[in-house]
Amino acid sequence: PLSNDELMHIGASLGADVPYCFDGSTQLAEGIGEILKPLSPMPNAYILLVKPPINVSTALIYEQIDNAPIEIRPDTDGMIDSLNNNDLYGVADRLCNVMENVTAKMYPIVGGIKTKMIINGAVNAVMSGSGPTVFGIFDDFEKAKKSADSFAYQFKDVFLTQVLN
């Protein structure tokens, strides 16, 4: 059998996000995502994911982001402090994605999903990766479920889950 470190090394050759899948706890990813450092657990929350029926070209997003102003930057230290304090609202406030504005300009549906999640009671909502999936963080199951139901009428790929630590 392979050790966890060996699996993570092999996984990194498959993709930058793969090593995370071997551990799964809350981690700080550095490098291209292959260097992982354990963090305090994520506070309890409900996560709603909605993927609109479009395909986003990651290559095109990266090409466009090179020419776009970066309006937001991650507050890594603030995020770590919020995790250490088990502060869901602090975590949610610090969620950001520097690619979101570029993708949302090209695919307005992304911004529409984000806005609707927040109207539906999400503490925050952010696009995942280069898109088009948007995830919302909810502090209450009923709000999360009602939001999921409201999206299920329009989209096939709607998933509601809970943070596991």
Residue ranges and their predicted role:
Residues P132-T133:
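Conserved glycine-rich beta-strand-loop-beta hairpin in the small C-terminal domain of fold type I
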Residues G136:
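Conserved SAM-binding motif I beta-strand of class I
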